């Protein structure tokens, strides 16, 4: 029951963001980065998942931001939405909700901080690799005429 309510509120928030012009405003802010923005795109997905604990929620909230930013900087919108999804995986590995659920499952509740400290270096490495793939990948795909 609570899961359904949470998803409804997340989707409602995404719609409010769209109708109020927040998505366009945030996209305009991110477009300042210009052609370098795809490097930062996975970080937005990771942040969304870290905060909400859900990849679906992060995609609902920030997928439109990625598409609008892509239009602003002349990048491939599918590439940036995929970059957001790549960041979602990173955010999920360090999301407090995911860590708490995992620790409860193995009867180690209360050791959240300890596990987060162990996960952060791997998450940081993964997000840096993801950012590099997203940045350089857009040019590689463009060379082959795919993007």
Predicted regions and their residues:
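Helical membrane-embedded segments and adjacent short helical loop/helix-boundary regions
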Residues: 1-7, 37, 121, 126
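Hydrophobic alpha-helical transmembrane segments of multi-pass integral membrane proteins
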Residues: 5-17, 34-65
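Alpha-helical transmembrane segments of multi-pass membrane proteins
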Residues: 6-8, 36-50, 73-97
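Transmembrane helix-loop junctions in multi-pass membrane proteins
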Residues: 14-26, 51, 134-145
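Short glycine/threonine-rich loop-to-helix capping motif typified by GTGT followed
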Residues: 17-23, 56, 97, 101
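Membrane-interface interhelical connector segments
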Residues: 18-35, 64-65, 73
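Hydrophobic transmembrane alpha-helices that form the pore/transport pathway of multi-pass ion
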Residues: 28, 51-85, 122
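Juxtamembrane and boundary regions of transmembrane helices in multi-pass small-molecule transporters
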Residues: 89-147
């Amino acid at each position: 029951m609570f899961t359904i309510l949470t998803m409804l509120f997340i989707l409602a928030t995404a719609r409010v963001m769209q109708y109020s012009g927040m998505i366009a405003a945030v996209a305009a802010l991110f477009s300042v980065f210009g052609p370098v923005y795809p490097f930062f795109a996975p970080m937005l997905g990771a942040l969304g998942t870290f905060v909400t604990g859900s990849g679906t929620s992060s995609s609902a909230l920030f997928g439109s931001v990625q598409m609008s930013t892509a239009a602003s900087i002349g990048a491939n919108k599918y590439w940036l939405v995929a970059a957001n999804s790549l960041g979602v995986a990173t955010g999920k590995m360090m999301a407090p909700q995911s860590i708490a659920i995992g620790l409860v499952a193995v009867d180690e509740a209360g050791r959240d901080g300890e596990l987060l400290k162990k996960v952060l270096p791997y998450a940081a490495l993964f997000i840096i690799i993801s950012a590099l793939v997203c940045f350089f990948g857009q040019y590689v795909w463009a060379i082959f005429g795919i993007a």
